[in-house]
Amino acid sequence: LEKEDITGNVCYDNLNHANMTRNRAQKIQKLQDIIPDLAVQGKSDTLVLGWGSTRGSILTAVDILKDRGVEVATCHLHHMNPFPKNLGDVLRAHKQVIIPEINTGQLRLLIRSEFLVDAIGINNLAGRSFFVKELADEIEAAMKGGAK
């Protein structure tokens, strides 16, 4: 079931459905023109990329790492579909990308498939936010090549 292109009438035509699906995808992609560029905080070869409720935990963990003398860059996604235009450039500007998530790593899978970046996931399945010291320890371990 689809609306007919131009008239908006109900239409069951396969070709019309394909056309309308492409139209919707193009409209979504055009949103990239108004989505602000992704802002990166800090300078480092390692980027910690977050989204959603991980923001506070990531920022606090990064502060803990700075106190330890470990430099980490961070940024936070506010838009997922489409991604900000500069996301690919931001990812490629860092040798290592770490993505803490309170799930099984769906964003990491999207980043890996869309941008071919071998991002490292830190996944929390405890049903609560990250403990910031624990997250800082896991980020530092990932930076050294080992997962905790």
Label for each model-derived stretch:
Residues 1-148:
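Flexible, low-complexity linker and terminal segments
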